[in-house]
Design a protein with these regions (language model features):
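Short, charge-rich amphipathic alpha-helices with coiled-coil/heptad character
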Residues: 1-3
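A charged helix-plus-loop insertion that forms the helical arch/lid used to bind
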Residues: 40-46
Length: 188
């Protein structure tokens, strides 16, 4: 095959992938509806995701496995983002407990948060990816503690963006749900 023929084949595959992803998002919508009805707004289930990744990778050739798992992880991250966005839209008042007594200036351009996650592969790269997926950049990331005994890491992040924006509020909500400890430290 020529390079052009190979690219044409890839171009023919991409719409099929899109159709399957849209079907998967339809399922994610139904999951969010079920969670909303039950009152359990937790979407992130690392144990279930690990099980899925293990099962799906069994029949993938070793030389393709890490790339394949990277794509599957990204699909799961996008699904969680979609579900958390829906849950946020459907439930008033989810954001207010996160800001406590913090005053958000109208011209706020950054948010400093502290969060703890299990110290495992992709734990922090998922956070960084999530920030970018919501359309924001990180200005600073500082390791506060690496608790090897408990297997956790705590970071302080400064995210560039306005906490008055709905997408930033959705990001904060998702971070609060996916981190063991989450706190908005300052807004400026």
């Amino acid at each position: 095959m020529t390079l052009e023929e190979i690219r044409n084949e890839i171009d023919a595959i991409d719409p099929k992938i899109r159709a399957l992803l849209m079907k998967r998002f339809d399922c994610a919508y139904q999951v969010a509806e079920a969670k909303n009805r039950s009152g359990d707004l937790r979407v992130y289930r690392p144990d279930r995701e690990d099980e899925i990744l293990s099962r799906l990778s069994e029949e993938v050739a070793e030389e393709k496995r890490s790339g394949y798992l990277s794509v599957v992880r990204k699909i799961m991250q996008a699904s969680r983002m979609y579900q958390y966005g829906l849950l946020y839209d459907w439930n008033e008042g989810l954001f207010e407990p996160l800001i406590r007594d913090i005053v958000i200036p109208g011209n706020a351009s950054r948010v400093r948060v502290r969060l703890s996650r299990p110290n495992r592969p992709n734990a922090m790269s998922e956070i960084l990816s999530m920030i970018g997926d919501y359309g924001y950049n990180m200005e600073l990331m500082e390791l506060i503690s690496d608790n090897r005994e408990e297997g956790t890491v705590t970071f302080e992040l400064t995210i560039l963006g306005n906490l008055n924006e709905t997408n930033m509020k959705k990001l904060m909500f998702q971070l609060s749900m996916e981190c063991m400890i989450f706190r908005i430290e300052a807004v400026g």
